[in-house]
Amino acid sequence: MTMGLSRLARLAALAAALLATIAAPALPVGAQEKPRTGGILTWFDYGDPGRLDVHAESPLVVQQATAGIFSGLLQYDPDEPSKIIGDLAERWTASADGKTYTFHLRKGVKWHDGQPFSSADVKASFDRVLNPDFKSPKCGASLKPMVASVEAVDPNTVEFRLKFAAAPFLPSIASAWCRVAAKHVLAKYGDLNAAEAQIGTGPFKFKKYERGSVIEWEKNPSYFVPGLPYLDGVKQFILVGGPTQLAAAKASKIMLWDAWPPMRKTQADELGRARTDVDIYQAPINTVFFIYLNAKKPPFDNPDMRRAVNLAIDRQELVAKSLEGAGVPCAILDPKLVGDFALPLDEVAKAPGCRQPKDADVAEAKRLVEKHYPGGLDVEVAVRQVGNYVDRGQLVIAQLRKIGIRGTMKTHESAAGYAAFGKGDFTIIASQDRSMDVNEPSGVFHIAYTSQSGSNYGQYSDPKVDELTERALKETNHDKRKQAYWELQRYLLTKGDHASIAVAWVEGWFFKDKKLRNYKPGLTTYDNNTFMKVWIAQ
């Protein structure tokens, strides 16, 4: 695929390409394949989720593990992934001032345990994620700045009252993380972590979870959309590490690789030589490669030391060596994904820490370190053992050594790493990709930069960042909103002392088995993975 394509254009081109492969079998002119029921789709998770609470967790593996189990009020259309359509809500209206949204719910929907669904479940779910004392790093982080209250008007009607008219509200409600859980299940279990608590209204029922091995769904025969799903089930193998994942793909153990971590070019080429029954494609995945510094303890409670790391990190080298060139270095927003809300890349390339050659920035970084630590210093550099994080971490350690910061690697199992990072138990996280919840410019700031961000692991707070983010969120005029986001990006790039350092927007290679039909990639790595309309051809 052409690297310059926007996400939407890329989706359209990919959909056309996949449609062409569907049409490839010998069919009469004008004939269409009839969806076939049955079969198991095989897929993979990059790690063991451990915990399964979609409201309280942020790892992709949690969302993937539960994607087909729960429904939302809204969803992104499986047939047209840029379009928001109803899910549990059959229709909705907005007030003239854009501050009140009323959702009219489907009638007759049942939970997987046979209990009836109602507006009480919607209110319980969103009251939970909006509770100031409840940490909801995805759905809650998106909605808390916008939503004032949620009311159940009657058993089939829910009303959301906003603090202000907000363009990202509907995309956030349609997010794959803003799923509706059963009030009676929350009351019984207290959270959604147990396999027994995975009781949804989605196209599939939770069947099995073997830690470190496999997650399985089975068809929900009482799904509220007649005739769906087509599949009998979905099997997700837990495959840790690129070599293991690639070996499974080459051996035809999995039919789809559509999520993080993407294949690198060399892996995609190797797969292409091993299998001719797959469609391989390149795409951005709405994901940022971050380095995090712990701003709550030495040495990175010192803004000079945070600036030193920001100056020293060679983003271009990290993209070239760890992503094989498939990424957009330095950008806080990627123009391929959010258009002109992103600061022009030629301006970004001149920012401290991004400009090439690196000599002047490295010299200044070294001066700042020597000012506070004349003999240099030793630090622990943490990564989770997923993707190619360890390799990235070694590159980061080598770059920091040039300015007198001597790093020692500490690796974590995936779930244990998330737990440690969430508690602030680290000094540097050398590599942590964060995927956007919605294809919307506000997403990255609510994920990693504001004081209340769900993935602001460094716990750094800058009132100016919070103020600019809120101003951009409230603005409804496109040009004024663009200027607000430009000001915010310039501020972060110029000040250079934030504890969340954006290395690059990640791109990569993916594949689908040619037998899969009705599959289209979503706007984010979290979307369109319920597989409600996917079927397997013979």
Positions of PLM-derived features:
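Surface-exposed binding/hinge segments that line
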Residues: 33, 104, 139-186, 208
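Alpha-helical secondary-structure segments
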Residues: 42, 118-127, 155-161, 202-203, ...
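Ligand/substrate-recognition segments at binding pockets and active sites
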Residues: 43, 211, 241, 258, ...
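N-terminal lobe/hinge region of extracytoplasmic solute-binding protein
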Residues: 44-96, 127, 197-200
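Detector for C-terminal structural segments
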Residues: 60, 64, 210-214, 219, ...
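Aromatic- and charge-enriched surface segment that lines or borders ligand/interaction sites
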Residues: 90-135, 153, 159-161, 245-248, ...
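Extracellular/periplasmic solute-recognition and catalytic clefts
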Residues: 149-152, 207-218, 235-297, 320, ...
